[in-house]
């Protein structure tokens, strides 16, 4: 007898996030769906980023968190009123000089000076699409400081925004750190973690995407939280990271799956190579 296909394992269509995102997991979503435990109702992501895993998984509910208040503010605005958001973005995206350095840096300055949540959400998308390499980076004054990307063409992600808004009706977006987010999990949940990566030996240190360094001690603490959730609450936790001696050591006790993926962050095209990615599975 034929069994029905599980839609958590094989999403019919892959949906791209409306944001560019350094270290995004769009290429890893099929592998992750294959290791997520079945019959769980809620996916919890303490490091949601652009939301590629959320967009390409099929759970009843989502709890999606990040420590970047601009990102969570943007997601909540898109969720609540995508039509108004799109109409506000278009004049900025389609301005005659939108793809120039002068215009970009003027908008960046406006973003850094503004305290209006809606204005910041609109400019965040513009800066993301026109800035360098999908980076989201702030300086010590909490000012967005990603340089102009100087791309030949640009794209307004209206379809992606509308799909995100549709999918987001089953999601809650929270500005919280990973420890706070772990506390929200119950027996119906699976936790997926995509932390800022510890740099490879040849990399410059681009781990502090939200202006907060996520160092080796944070990496170790996250691993301990995953182990504690597994042993104390019988929760399943999945973590993706570079496949290195360090990550294999801190995730010791998990089941490992190794895959090769294209790097989505670099300072030069020569560094866009396939690297070994480790998926650590703490099965509850």
Which ranges hold each PLM region?
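Short loop/helix-cap segments at secondary-structure boundaries that form the rim of catalytic
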Residues: 53-59, 183-185, 246-253
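Short, well-ordered beta-strand micro-motif
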Residues: 126, 279-282
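Conserved acidic-Pro-Pro-aromatic motif
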Residues: 188-279
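Conserved S-adenosyl-L-methionine
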Residues: 35-94
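SAM-dependent nucleic-acid methyltransferase catalytic core
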Residues: 2-28, 34, 81-207, 221-232
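Short His-Asn-centered micro-motif
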Residues: 46-47, 65, 174-176, 193, ...
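Short, polar loop motifs at secondary-structure junctions
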Residues: 47-52, 160, 241-245
């Amino acid at each position: 007898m034929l069994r029905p296909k599980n839609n958590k394992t094989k999403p019919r269509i892959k949906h791209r996030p409306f944001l560019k995102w350094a270290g995004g997991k769009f290429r890893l979503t099929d592998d992750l769906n294959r290791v997520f435990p079945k019959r769980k109702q809620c996916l919890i992501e303490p490091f949601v980023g652009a939301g590629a895993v959320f967009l390409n998984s099929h759970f009843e509910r989502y709890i999606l968190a990040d420590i970047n208040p601009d990102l969570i503010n943007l997601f909540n605005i898109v969720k609540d009123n995508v039509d108004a958001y799109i109409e506000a973005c278009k004049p900025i995206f389609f301005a005659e000089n939108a793809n120039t350095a002068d215009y970009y840096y003027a908008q960046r300055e406006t973003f850094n000076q503004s305290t209006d949540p809606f204005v910041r959400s609109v400019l965040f998308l513009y800066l993301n699409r026109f800035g360098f390499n999908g980076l989201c980076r702030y300086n010590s004054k909490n000012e967005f400081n990603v340089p102009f990307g100087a791309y030949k063409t640009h794209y307004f992600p209206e379809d992606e925004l509308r799909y995100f808004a549709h999918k987001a009706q089953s999601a809650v977006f929270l500005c919280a750190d990973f420890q706070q987010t772990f506390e929200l999990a119950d027996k119906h949940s699976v936790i997926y973690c995509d932390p800022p990566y510890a740099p490879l030996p040849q990399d410059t240190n681009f781990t502090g995407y939200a202006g907060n360094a996520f160092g080796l001690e944070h990496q170790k603490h996250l691993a301990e939280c995953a182990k504690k959730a597994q042993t104390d609450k019988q929760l399943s936790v999945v973590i993706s990271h570079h496949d290195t001696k360090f990550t294999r050591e801190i995730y010791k006790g998990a089941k490992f799956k190794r895959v090769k993926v294209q790097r989505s962050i670099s300072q030069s095209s020569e560094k866009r190579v396939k690297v070994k990615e480790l998926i650590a599975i703490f099965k509850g």
